[in-house]
Swiss-Prot record:
One of its GO terms (biological process) is convergent extension involved in gastrulation. The active site is at D397 (proton acceptor). This is Tyrosine-protein kinase fynb. A lipid is attached at C3, C6 (S-palmitoyl cysteine). SMART domains: SH2, SH3, TyrKc. ATP binds at L284, G285, N286, G287, Q288, F289, G290, E291, V292, K306. Its main location: cytoplasm. InterPro entries: Fyn/Yrk_SH2, Fyn/Yrk_SH3, Kinase-like_dom_sf, Non-receptor_tyrosine_kinases, Prot_kinase_dom, Protein_kinase_ATP_BS, Ser-Thr/Tyr_kinase_cat_dom, SH2. It comes from Danio rerio. Gene3D superfamilies: Phosphorylase Kinase, domain 1 (3.30.200.20), SH2 domain (3.30.505.10), SH3 Domains (2.30.30.40), Transferase(Phosphotransferase) domain 1 (1.10.510.10). The lineage of its organism: Eukaryota, Metazoa, Chordata, Craniata, Vertebrata. Residues 278-531 form the Protein kinase domain.
Length: 544
């Protein structure tokens, strides 16, 4: 099995894994446990830029050069660096982790398990490859493959996956007790975390996390009494017996298909596409400035298409802004794929099957959601906005209508940055029905001063939409009354069945002084640990 006894337990003594953030998440926690503030990121401090994107917030952090890769940032390729030969001869072989259907004549279709020789890996997210099964050559998405016999090729290995996202995936409907995954440790370089779905009478379904440490000799262990040469051997050992874990490992967590950041290798750099390459199939929504459709690109790739009414915005300004939007890449932001920049403007993005969060809460599955799910959705939005905050960008129109929902209650932010470009007179005057007064911070509504802190105000309003299942903010008040009353210090009361601790967070978002409002980094940390802040992050095994 690869398990060896520790020769010097003192030399590899287990350290205390407990810290202030939590790992054991589930439906059994009571509402309203507040995290201890000192354990969270700076409440209202500003972030530092991490990519060369124009600074809309007057931050002074130095931008990192465009070639630098940051976690969750510009580059999304799983495998980086030069492909090396083994033993000086041959090439490293890669294996497909998923099925893929070619989208263009340049792509290569393949099936899970197929092996490849990589011809050229200089195109970033798309590699030129030769299939050893069919002999065919073409471009393949690099995040669909991994080196043969590597841990990246294992079904249970999820790489850079955060604790909260691991819990989200493991707690998805249909996963039995013992469903597991291994991911990179967020806190310890070179270490890993084992996350397991568990169940008991008190907590119901929940997730436990165990730290996998690395020996100086290269082996791995959870407890010093059971050490392994490889992660594969560790998994095999705990598949056969619990050996101090909450339960034995039963089945790897299902991996969803990875998101592609481009439609194809050609649209990676040339992403203005012909209108005739798009087919509008089903209208999903109709707004003041256009429509949203489910459609296809090239007849084979499902996408969402936002069509804008002529005159809504300048094509030149839109294209300039889209250049920036295309560089924003985060798993909680709807990915921009391509545009048709001649009027009527088309914006092509990834498709989210459950529609807008507003409709989902009012008329869809969201009506039955309980507070833990709602807080988790808020945490996802805060996570996407924390990325926008780090990139020194601004949304300007953050509300539930501009959040999209996918499978497993995944939430992604849409329409970031577009509000700045709208040329409608009634909208630009920040008056009348077209402008979202009830979501807008007073300094932005009255004086046009939009910053990331005005987005924080809007996020506080979005929180009320979540806990009230899509109720319009400030019920019974019109826009003029809202402006007047908010300027006089009025703030919405705590909604029915909303914990006072969550309402207090809303009130912090609505501070009159914008600089006193929390950062999105803080909001994300607070909400992710809302029910779990008093628990240890990692579980010790029984008698370990």
């Amino acid at each position: 099995m690869g398990c060896v006894q520790c020769k010097d337990k003192e030399a590899a003594k287990l350290t205390d894994d407990r810290d202030t953030s939590l790992s054991q998440s589930g439906v059994g926690y009571r509402y309203g446990v507040d995290p201890t503030p000192q354990h969270y990121p700076a409440f209202s401090g500003t972030g530092t830029a991490v990519a060369a994107i124009p600074n809309y917030n007057n931050f002074h952090g130095a931008a990192v050069s465009q070639g630098m890769t940051v976690f969750g940032g510009i580059s999304t390729s799983t495998h980086q660096g030069t492909l090396r030969t083994r033993g000086g001869t041959g090439v490293t072989l890669f294996v497909a982790l998923y099925d893929y259907e070619a989208r263009t004549e340049d792509d290569l279709s393949f099936r899970k398990g197929e092996k490849f020789q990589i011809i050229n890996s200089t195109e970033g997210d798309w590699w030129d490859a030769r299939s050893l099964t069919t002999g065919g050559t073409g471009y393949i998405p690099s995040n669909y493959v991994a080196p043969v016999d590597s841990i990246q090729a294992e079904d249970w290995y999820f790489g850079k996956l955060g604790r909260k996202d691991a819990e989200r995936q493991l707690l998805s409907t249909g996963n039995p007790r013992g469903t597991f995954l291994i991911r990179e440790s967020e806190t310890t370089k070179g270490a890993f975390s084992l996350s397991i779905r568990d169940w008991d009478d008190v907590k119901g379904d929940h997730v436990k996390h165990y730290k996998i440490r690395k020996l100086d000799s290269g082996g791995y262990y959870i407890t010093t009494r059971a050490q392994f040469e490889t992660l594969q051997q560790l998994v095999q050992h705990y598949t056969e017996r619990a050996a101090g874990l909450c339960c034995r490992l039963v089945v790897p967590c299902h991996k969803g298909m990875p998101r592609l950041t481009d439609l194809s290798v050609k649209t990676k750099d040339v992403w203005e596409i012909p209108r005739e390459s798009l087919q509008l199939i089903k209208r999903l929504g109709n707004g003041q400035f256009g429509e949203v459709w489910m459609g296809t690109w090239n007849g084979n790739t499902k996408v969402a298409i936002k069509t804008l009414k002529p005159g809504t915005m300048s094509p030149e300004s839109f294209l300039e802004e889209a250049q920036i939007m295309k560089k924003l890449r985060h798993d909680k932001l709807v990915q921009l794929y391509a545009v048709v920049s001649e009027e009527p403007i088309y914006i092509v993005t990834e498709y989210m099957g459950k529609g807008s969060l507003l409709d989902f809460l009012k008329d869809g599955e969201g009506r039955a959601l309980k507070l833990p799910n709602l807080v988790d959705m808020a945490a996802q939005v805060a996570g996407g906005m924390a990325y926008i905050e780090r990139m020194n960008y601004i949304h300007r129109d953050l509300r539930s209508a501009n959040i999209l929902v996918g499978d497993s209650l995944v939430c992604k932010i849409a329409d970031f940055g577009l509000a700045r470009l709208i040329e409608d007179n009634e909208y630009t005057a920040r008056q009348g029905a077209k402008f979202p007064i009830k979501w807008t911070a007073p300094e932005a509504a009255l004086y046009g001063k939009f910053t990331i802190k005005s987005d924080v105000w809007s996020f506080g309003i979005l929180l009320t939409e979540l806990v009230t299942k899509g109720r319009v903010p400030y019920p019974g008040m019109n826009n003029r009354e809202v402006l007047e009353q908010v300027e006089r210090g009025y703030r919405m009361q705590c909604p029915q069945d909303c914990p006072s601790s969550l309402h207090e967070l809303m009130v912090q978002c609505w501070k009159k002084d914008a600089e006193e409002r929390p950062t999105f980094e803080y909001l994300q940390a607070f909400l992710e640990d809302y029910f779990t802040a008093t628990e240890p992050q990692y579980q010790p095994g029984d008698n370990l």
